[in-house]
Design a protein with these regions (language model features):
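Boundary/entry segment of secreted carbohydrate-active catalytic domains
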Residues: 5, 9-26
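H/E-rich (His + Asp/Glu) clusters that bind or coordinate divalent metals
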Residues: 239, 246, 253, 257-259
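Active-site beta-loop-alpha junctions enriched in small/polar residues
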Residues: 18-22, 46-50, 83-86, 126-128, ...
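C-terminal helical cap(s) of enzyme catalytic domains, especially alpha/beta-barrels
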Residues: 270-291
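Short, well-ordered coil/turn segments that N-cap beta-strands
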Residues: 10-15, 39-41, 72-79, 116-119, ...
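Active-site acidic/histidine proton-transfer and metal-coordination neighborhood
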Residues: 29-30, 36, 70-74, 87-189, ...
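Glycine-rich, proline-tolerant flexible connector loops at the mouths of alpha/beta enzymes
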Residues: 46-68, 125-132
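Acidic/histidine-rich catalytic cores of soluble enzymes
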Residues: 12-14, 43, 136, 143-240, ...
Length: 297
């Protein structure tokens, strides 16, 4: 059975849904069904720093089969992973024990992705998160990135840096510094529209010009709303992200996979929030796709 291919053929792109936009109490099947009913093409799984989410990387075969069964029954894939577990165990941590644990998480995440047919992992762009960065942490970060890229190459899984809310890697240009250092076809950039928009105010550089610095290396894009100085839980359409312009630029750069990133915050009508987000984001993406078709013609 071909899962999710219809959307690619009809629209030329795929729009995924961030897992944390739904209640944590839902089963795998319920999450995939909710995404499908709201009009999304796939779900991006979250592997954050909590013990509960990190435990997913240690799943037994029976648990993995539950996920595969849910994907078969719904016709919706878990198409990518947002791996933010490195906040707690950074790849550049000065503590070798934490650094080793971070690399275990990296290897397990790649193996987990391979087992489920997931081809993309978004990496948090931090050398360290809870500590101050130093030359030592940056050196360790680069060294472990090289190893991680080799692991990804072995598994055929693409790694992409998220542009973050901290100065270490809050722009595509900064992410590209490390992509160019590692020089692996399996390490690219997976930016966040909300974070880029906030960074543009800090540095006085347009979001679109910053995105251009990643030409040929942007593997997917998080579509997230933000307001100056605030990076999370901003409803679509109430912030300052120019989704139409970002979508058009991403399309021009060859990006065809997008994820709507937003959070479930207890709203009883969370399914309505999913549907609204799908409509809102597809308006920008469909316009970008139409612009792309006219440009080619």
């Amino acid at each position: 059975m071909s899962i999710g291919m219809g959307a690619i053929m009809k629209k030329g792109y795929q729009l995924g849904l961030y897992e944390k936009s739904m209640p944590v109490t839902l089963t795998w099947c319920e999450k995939l069904t909710a995404a499908k009913d709201a009009g999304f093409d796939y779900v991006e799984m979250s592997i954050d720093e909590t013990d509960e989410k990190l435990a997913r990387l240690e799943m037994k075969a029976e648990e993995m089969d539950e996920i595969r069964t849910a994907m078969r029954r719904t016709g919706v894939m878990f198409g990518s992973i947002c791996l933010s577990g490195h906040r707690k165990y950074p790849l550049g941590d000065p503590d070798p024990v934490k650094r080793t644990r971070g690399m275990e998480i990296m290897e397990n995440a790649i193996d987990f992705a391979v087992a489920l047919g997931i081809r993309t992992i978004q990496l948090a762009g931090y050398d360290v998160y809870y500590d101050e960065g130093t030359d030592e942490t940056r050196t360790a970060f680069v060294g472990n990135l090289r190893v991680a890229a080799q692991m990804a190459a072995r598994g055929g899984v693409q790694l992409g840096f998220e542009t973050m809310e901290t100065a270490f890697m809050d722009t595509v240009e900064k992410a590209m510094y490390y992509v160019d250092l590692v020089r692996s076809p399996y390490l690219g950039v997976y930016p966040d529209s909300g974070n880029l928009t906030n960074a543009s105010l800090i540095y006085g550089k347009s979001v679109l010009d910053d995105m251009e610095t990643g030409r040929g290396h942007i593997i997917a894009l998080h579509l997230k709303e933000s307001v100056p100085g605030k990076y999370r839980e901003i409803p679509f359409g109430t912030g300052h992200v120019d989704f139409a312009a970002v979508a058009k630029k991403a399309w021009a750069l060859g990006v065809r996979r997008y994820v709507g990133e937003f959070w479930y915050t207890g709203n009883a009508d969370w399914k309505g929030d999913l549907s609204f987000a799908n409509t809102f984001l597809r308006r920008a993406l469909d316009a970008a796709a139409e612009w792309g078709r006219k440009t080619i013609c």
